[in-house]
Amino acid sequence: MGSSTPSNELPALQEAFNFPDGPQSMLPATTFLIGFVLGPLFFAPLSEQYGRRPILISTLCLYIIFTMGTALSPNWAAFLIFRFLSGIFASPPMSVTGGSIADVFVDKVVRGRANMLWSSATLLGPLAGPVIAGYTYQYSWRWAFWASMAFSGICLIALVFQPETLATKILRDRAAKLNKEKGAERYIAPADMDKPGLLVTLKITTTRPLYLLCTEMLVALTCVYMAFVYAVFYMLLKIFPNIFHGIYGFTPGESGLAFVMMFAGSLISNVLGYFYDIYAQGLVRRHPNKHAEYLRLPLACVGGPAFVISLFWLGWTSRLSIHWIVPLLSMIPYGFGYQCIFMAMINYTADAYGIFASSALAALAACRSIAGAIIPLAVDSMIGTLGIAWSCSVLALISCALSLVPFGFIIWGEKIRAASNFSKKLQNAPHPDLELTRSVSIV
C-alpha cells in the first residue's frame, strides 16, 4: 500500500512541493522501492537467525514513525528521504512472511494455500493505495499517508499477539527459560551448538540472498521474470493517468476503477489456485517421489499469456473511438495473470529452498524492487516516443519472452537443480523440520 499511495495524488504533490512533471514524478515510488531493495537483504536472513516476530514488530514500528514523517514533510527533499526510510522498514513482510508460512505449514499443499492468501494481500496493498489517494487528495495529499499509518497501527496490534514461528528461536527461548528456572546453564538449543560469532553470522545471513541470486539459476531467472512483471505494475501507475485522465477525462478517484478491475482478476486467480491445489494434492498422493514444487508452476504457465494479452488489449483499445470500459476491462486478465505468476513463482521458490526460503524470497524482493524503482523512470520518454499503444506492445512482447521461464523450469528444472551444489546440499541434509523441532539438549 505504501509504495503506490502517492501515484494518484501527484497533482497535489506537485502543487505542494513545486517540482516539474517527468522523471521526478516517479521519485515518490522510486525512493520507496530503493528502500525495499535494501531491507530484505538484511531483515530476511536476520529473521532466520533471531526470529520472525522481533524483526516484524520492530520494523513495523519504525515504518509507522517514518510514514508519519512523510505526512508531515515540509519540503520535497524531506518527503523523499522519509519515503526512502519508509521503504526500508516496510520491506520485511515481503520476505519474512514467506519464511513464517514455511515455518508453520509443513504440508506443501496447505502452505501453498497460505502463500496464495499472502500473495493476494501483497497485491491488494498496492491496488488500495491509489484508490484511497484518489479520493483523499482533494482534501490534502497528507491524508493518504495518515490512512496508511492508521492501517499499519492496526496491523501492529495484531502482530503483537502473534507468536514466534521460527523453530530455532522457539527452542532457544525454551532453553533460556529452563536455565532461568534451574538457576544454571544446563540447557542449550541445537542451533546454538558450535554457534559462530555475531560478525560471522551477520556476514553469512546478509550475503546469502546475493549468493543464491548469483549461483542459483532458478533464483536468477525467477528474479528476472518477477522483477519485470513488478516493474510493469509501476509503469501502469504512470500510464493510467495518460489513458483515463488524458483520453477519457476521468478524475483521480474514477481512475481507481482500473485497480478495482485488477483486484477482480486477482480474485479469479485465487479461485483457480484453490481448485488447482486440490488437483495438485491428488497428484502428490499418486506420485510421492516427484518434486512437488514443480506442481506450482502450471499456474504461472496460465498467468503469463493472460498478462501478455492484457497489455496488448490495454494499449490498442485506449482511444476516444472506443468506449472507456473496453481498456478498463483489460485489467481483469492483467490482475489474473499478475497474481497467478506471483503465486506460482513464490510458492515454487519457497518449496524449492526450504529453510532458506526467506533468503531466496529476499533475493526476489530485492530484484523486483530495483526494477520497480528504475524501469518506470523511462515511462514518460517511452510514451512520448512510441505512444500508448506501442509502449504497451513493447512491454507485452518482453513479457511474452519471459513467460517461457516457468515452462523451462518444468522441462529442465530437475537438471538445473542436479547441477547446483547448493541444491544438492539442501536435498542431502537431514530433514529441516525434524532437525529444527528436536527438544532442547542437556549439556
What are these regions (language model features)?
Residues 1-22, 38, 43, 93, ...:
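Extracytoplasmic
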Residues 38-77:
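Conserved MFS/SLC helix-loop-helix module at the cytosolic interface between two early adjacent transmembrane helices
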Residues 6-7, 204-270, 341-347:
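Extracytoplasmic gate region of multi-pass secondary transporters
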Residues 27-44, 260-273:
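Central cavity-lining transmembrane alpha-helices of secondary-active solute carriers
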Residues 17-18, 42, 50-51, 72-78, ...:
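Helix-breaking motifs and short loop linkers at transmembrane-helix boundaries and internal kinks
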Residues 13-14, 46-47, 69, 79, ...:
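Interfacial helix-cap and linker-helix signal at transmembrane-aqueous boundaries
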Residues 1-3, 7, 11, 142-143, ...:
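Intracellular terminal tails of multi-pass secondary transporters
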Residues 82-122:
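Cytoplasmic helix-loop-helix junction between adjacent transmembrane helices
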